[in-house]
Curated annotation (Swiss-Prot):
Organism ancestry: Eukaryota, Metazoa, Spiralia, Lophotrochozoa, Mollusca
Keyword Disulfide bond annotated: yes
An MF annotation (GO) of this entry: toxin activity
Protein name as annotated: Conotoxin Cl14b
Protein source organism: Californiconus californicus (California cone)
GO terms under cellular component: extracellular region
Amino acid sequence: YRRRQCPPWCSGEPCRKGTC
């Protein structure tokens, strides 16, 4: 997933870093 495409279960640093 990319920064603009964050799933509901992803949030915080992982979403910002794009490591979802």
